[in-house]
Amino acid sequence: ITNEAFGPYTVHWAYDTYSLSKGTATAAVKAGGDTWFFITADYAFGHDLEKDASHFVEANGGKVLGRARHPLNTPDFSSFLLQAQTAGAKVVGLANAGADMITAVKQSSEFGLTKSGQKLAVLLGYISDVESLGLPVAKGLLLTEPFYWDRTPETRAWSQRFFEKFKRMPTAAQASVYSSMTHYLKAVKQAGSTDSAAVMKIMKETPVKDFVADNGVVREDGRMVHDMYLCQVKAPEESKGKW
């Protein structure tokens, strides 16, 4: 919905496969993880994650040794993990999300994948996924996020309000939805109208400066350009709290 495919009344706020892949793949290769094997969800989203991550692996001097594609909602990743182990890649990139990503990480731990020296790179994951996995299993995972609740005083203040209502810290998606809707509603108020053209004009003219984006801007094609953050899951002994 952006770049050459943009429309006059659409905005793309939080992330896409390009930004998610760039941070994680680039950092992993520069840290020595220069050979990759992908375990990929076999539909458009997974294919795009794999394609974009492969581009950044190779652009930074790395090499993709292979890939295995799995159906949505796969209960058993053993054959795919065995292929990843056999390939001997330094990094196993998980180009999937949600239940598939969680299952793949859990089973990789059971297989001893990381204990044998391979690293896991999650190309889309949320803090709720890490909480579900638990730190003993998730420790060391690399992922790229547009938001983390404990990054600044502003992120902590907003996240505490969220926690008081929902009894859990917000994911990047939840924070980004709030950020985008607030920017829209402020533009409606300033325009004194819900006319799409008038509101979009103000949204694009007004910098995005809130608890999600320190220096965001809605580009002419509707993409909100902002910082992304490379994250690594702490080991249990490093963590000072549940979230």
Question: PLM features: what roles do these ranges have?
Answer:
Residues I1-T2, T17-Y18, D42-G46, H70-P75, ...:
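Solvent-exposed loop/turn segments at secondary-structure junctions
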Residues G7, V105-S179, V188-T194, E237:
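Extracellular/periplasmic periplasmic-binding protein-like sensory domains
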Residues F162-Q174, H183-W243:
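Segments of small-molecule ligand-sensing domains
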Residues I1-R69, Q118-K139:
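Extracytoplasmic ligand/sensor domains, especially the bilobed periplasmic-binding protein
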